[in-house]
Amino acid sequence: MAIAEWRQQLESGEVSARELTDHHLARIKAVDSSVHAFLEVTADRARADADRLDEARAAGEDLPPLAGVPIAIKDNLCTKGIRTTSSSRMLESFVPPYESTVTDRLWRSGAVLIGKTNLDEFAMGGSTETSAFGPTANPWNTGYVPGGSSGGSAAAVAAGECMASLGSDTGGSIRQPASFCGVVGLKPTYGRVSRYGLVAFASSLDQVGPFATSVSDAAELLQAIAGEDPRDSTCLKAPVPNYREVLGRSVSGLRIGVVRECFDQEGIDPQVKASVLAAAELLQSLGAELVDVSCPRFNDGIATYYVIAPSEASANLARYDGVKYGFRAEDASSLASMTARSRTEGFGSEVQRRILIGTYALSAGYVDAYYRKAQQVRTLIRRDFETAFASVDVLLTPTAPSTAFAAGAHADDPLAMYLADLLTIPANLAGLPAINVPCGFDSEGLPIGVQLIGNVLEEPLLLQVAHQYEQSADVMSRRPEGAFIPV
């Protein structure tokens, strides 16, 4: 059920907010032991919030736009009075005294918090296997990963445990799991959505965005969370347009740039390539013009990212020292010993790896060769995009080089794990909006996603193209039999 359809049923009294909430809580109870999308289910709060909305409707009050919509929140977004762990032992007992801007805006819009979702520890990973509280499974096949780092949020939507969810995207952490789980995932322009209350990973790259089962529902969530926030100095002051009203517009006459570098390289699954090119051809049949585009430094993004992101992470995570809050090692012999042991015992191996990489890249004698050089390449990547957008409206690529991989497949190969974000990272480095839309299935019945990238603040155009593709392709009507999630 789409959010707009649900709102009509709520307003007519056909279905109550409590009934919808109970339906999703029952779904969580039925399937989450297999999926493990949730770290915490806020059943009592969800029912209480739903009851208040039902009372407001019965009293004839105007209902907010997301009234009664059950939403899950990635557990690196602060929720006042509700544990926020970032899936790390370091923050296992942290209960925020304040609300993140995005969650506050959702609650003001009437959304119902149904729970907090699992993620790779501190959002560092591409499979949701580095969580200190156990991995999340892909609802399409529980022997496969859901992607990451927002795998819990993607899996919860895919498994029908909530109507929509929020995640964060630093190098693909919304779009890649959306592709693996067969849902829509949107990373907005950097600064379009406030980061206040998001546990920081890499501050120049992090952005919050929605997961949903449809483009229209993703637009509804973006409408609620976008906009200026004085508590985030990087948040843009640009007015928020009406994202809903663009969905019905045609793609006729738009120029879609097919990024050559994303298709002409080894490592792209032939089934993914064929499905994404078929998506491009469908857009062409709807009146769009396909244009062959080159972004020469697109594939340099991953090396650039794995200098910049760990460098920022090493600075951001320096605050966790066992003194003021977070995990503290017991029986330390000195302050230095307590700090060292707290960080060693509180952080998992992938987080430690990235801190070490970042600290090395920022160290005296190496900062010019690594960090400053990476920033220079980042500028060149931005310029490639600027050149491309001078001649096209939207860029089209696969979201990921492959479909979901088997659980544990990359456990001993960090590089293979990092390469899963090969095609999503450049949009983060350039601060551009990008969206994943399901476009097919591989021979194993696992979803494939197409990525659309827009220019700065061109979310309306992205949503327009994505919606028109989604409506014409009707991919989910072709999903294979035997999938875990026939909701």
From Swiss-Prot:
Enzymatic class: ligase
Source organism of the structure: Synechococcus sp. (strain CC9311)
Active site: 74, 149, 173
Cross-referenced Pfam families: Amidase (PF01425)
Domain of life assignment: Bacteria
PANTHER family membership: GLUTAMYL-TRNA(GLN) AMIDOTRANSFERASE SUBUNIT A, TRANSAMIDASE
Annotated EC: 6.3.5.7
Keyword Ubl conjugation set for record: no
Catalytic activity: L-glutamyl-tRNA(Gln) + L-glutamine + ATP + H2O = L-glutaminyl-tRNA(Gln) + L-glutamate + ADP + phosphate + H(+)
One GO term describing the cellular component: glutamyl-tRNA(Gln) amidotransferase complex
Function: Allows the formation of correctly charged Gln-tRNA(Gln) through the transamidation of misacylated Glu-tRNA(Gln) in organisms which lack glutaminyl-tRNA synthetase. The reaction takes place in the presence of glutamine and ATP through an activated gamma-phospho-Glu-tRNA(Gln).
Family: Belongs to the amidase family. GatA subfamily.
The name this protein goes by in its record: Glutamyl-tRNA(Gln) amidotransferase subunit A
GO molecular function, one term: glutaminyl-tRNA synthase (glutamine-hydrolyzing) activity
GO biological process, one term: translation
InterPro entries (alphabetical): Amidase (IPR000120), Amidase_CS (IPR020556), Amidase_dom (IPR023631), AS_sf (IPR036928), GatA (IPR004412)
Keywords associated with the record: ATP-binding, Ligase, Nucleotide-binding, Protein biosynthesis
Subunit text: Heterotrimer of A, B and C subunits.
